Every structure is written in C-alpha cells, then in structure tokens.
Amino acid sequence: WPASPSSGGCLDEPNDPNRGDVHYWKVWHGNRPFTEYRKYFFRYLSEFGFQAFPSVKTIEQFTDNEEDMNPFSYIMEKHQRQYSANGKIMGYMQQTYKYPNSFPTFVYASQLLQADGIRYGVEHFRRNRGRCMGAVYWQLNDCWPVISWSSVDYCGRLKALHYYAKRFFAPLMISCEEQGMMSSEANMNREHFVFEKSIRLNVANETMQDQNVTVRWALRDP
C-alpha cells in the first residue's frame, strides 16, 4: 500500500471515501459534533481521534502544586502540544456533560468524553460493515506525559477509551442508533424545537457462529 491515506494509486484523491483508506478529523480539529460521523461511510477509516487528559496520578508526576492542577495553568499548557486544545476539550464537554466541580473530576470526564466520541464513530462504522471494513483510532500510547489522543498514557495507565475499546471492538457487539427529526414547536411559550426520536438496536456478530443472546434495553435519567 503506497501511503496512508491513499486511494491506491499515486496522488489520485488520497482521501477518497470510496477507495482505499481515509483520515477523518472534522470531529476534533473541525469542531464538529460526534454525530458528524454518521454522515460518512468510508471504506476504511485508518485515522481519527479525540484528546483526553492522562490519569491524575500521571499528572501529579509533572506538576509541583495545586495551582498547576488547572487546564490552563502554565505547566498544563506546556504538556499540551496542540494550540488551544485544552479549551477545545472544554467546549465539547459543555455540550455533553454537566461541568465538573473539581480538577480530578474534569480529568475523568475528559476521558469519558474521548471514549464516547470514539465509540460513537466505531459503532456507526461497524453497523455499516460491508461498506466500511475497518476503523483505527489515533492513537494507542504516548512518548512523554502529555494531554493527547492516546488511550494509554505515558505511564502505562489506561484511559477510559481503552476500556471502551474492548467493548466496541468485541467480536459480538450491540449498539443503539437513535433516529429522529427536528420539528418546530408552534407555542412560543414552550421550547421552539423538539426532537421526535426512535431507536434501532443493532448486533454485530463477527464470530462466524450463530449466537443466542438476551438484550435488555432501558431509558434512564442522565
């Protein structure tokens, strides 16, 4: 294979979603929401990702005091090699979770955010197996203690994404695809928009054997 991404020949549209492998970064670098993944049906997604903070125990190894335990402290920014990325994490976080009330909680929430984002993409691509035959997230590990796209930090501590990956890459996996449309609410004293949603459960079975399973599904308050 000549390169990555590549459509299989020279420089002929190397990021062509219909041929070869693709790198996709509109989610994260392009600030697009996780739902953006569902607009695409790549043949093979060989690079995509989302950042998260390393374990608090790892952070404690490169910080000196409590003042450093802040996403925008001098030392924390020095351990973030993408400009303004800590703010980007916070921007995505406020769209997804209630804002954490402590730095350790913030660190953990950043890892859950990363895990949910990658899970959202992988589940979509696995639901479309046949069209999409692979998804490889960037990246596995780090070469120094840093806030990054990795699922294993520099000290070998697993982020939430690494635990999630064991589930969403399992040979037998169930996923839920919510479906719906936005409709206008005529009553001005109420919300202007409401979402009418339904759900579709999908089971991906790559064991090459028939499986008997029991599915339990429920709604709960966030």
Could you describe each region identified by the protein language model?
Residues W1:
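Conserved anion/nucleotide-ligand pocket segment
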